[in-house]
Amino acid sequence: MVRIIPLKKNEAPEEVRTQIQAADDVFGIQSVSAGIQAYCPPILNASRALSAAPNESNQLSAELRSLVCMRAAQIVLCPFWIDSNAAGSSKSGSSDEKIAAVSAWRTSSIFSREEKAAFELVEAMTQTPADISEEVFSNLKLLFNNEQIVELVATIA
């Protein structure tokens, strides 16, 4: 339930209108979070910058970033982000079979070692409290360099 009515682009401060339009372009509809964050332009700008940073880093494939975001959305039960990231995964090259198997990644043979390690990290980061075991981190270090791990954590966060 939305308790703060999102600002429409024409109601928002001039300095954040391009940010709202960019968010709307990504989703194809008005972004509720961008419209709400527009009440406080520094928050909207920081949020958009953090969201864009992993895409600009390019240490990881767009497909892996979309898959881990989809898994995180599944864990927190967010239908909008599940659908949005499924579409992003499809655009970035994931097969329909792979997208459908994300929730059952542990028993699926369709995922690479890197993808499975990333899914382990997603699950560790989305528990309360977050608990990334030495085993999970050691496995990441075997498959990813430090830059990739930082990008992966930022993508999941």
PLM-predicted stretches and their roles:
Residues 1-157:
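Hydrophobic alpha-helical segments
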